[in-house]
Amino acid sequence: MNKLYCAGTFCFDFLDSNYREMAKKDYRSLVLGDSALLLQKSDYVLLNKKLKYIGPFYFESEGMVDELIVSSEVGMIRECTHAVFLLDEGCCPGTIAELILASELKKNVQIFYIRRGDSEETESKLHTPCWFPIIMSQQINHNNTKVVECKNYEEAIDNILSYVRSL
């Protein structure tokens, strides 16, 4: 059974009054098919007969305790067989740490990133502020890291959903 971990910045905060509505736009809600599944703590969600979504979930610890969130997500990354990363506007430090951990553990890593224009982020041919962790992941885990350039968030989501369906 494949086990999927989907990393990236959550596009909402539970302190916002409309966080439940905003959660519906998070790519993990689309992978799960229902934002309610993302907002509840669970060991996993069965996506099909060959694939479990094992995390992250938005509420992973009682009271949102930071140390418990980190240890929980590290455990999920250790357990997963496939790790998806959506890198868009800028990398959250937690997402970068998750990417490097998954790479060090030689997981099947799929990175979907939003490419900026040719005149932006010219330090790398990737044209993204996330170029350094992407290249580091490729160097650490070259046999198991795939990088997919996307024009925008919608294309990234389409590519992620296609990838998940292929598992």
Question: Model-derived features: where do they sit?
Answer:
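Conserved catalytic or regulatory cores that recognize and/or transform ribose-phosphate-containing ligands
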Residues: 1-167
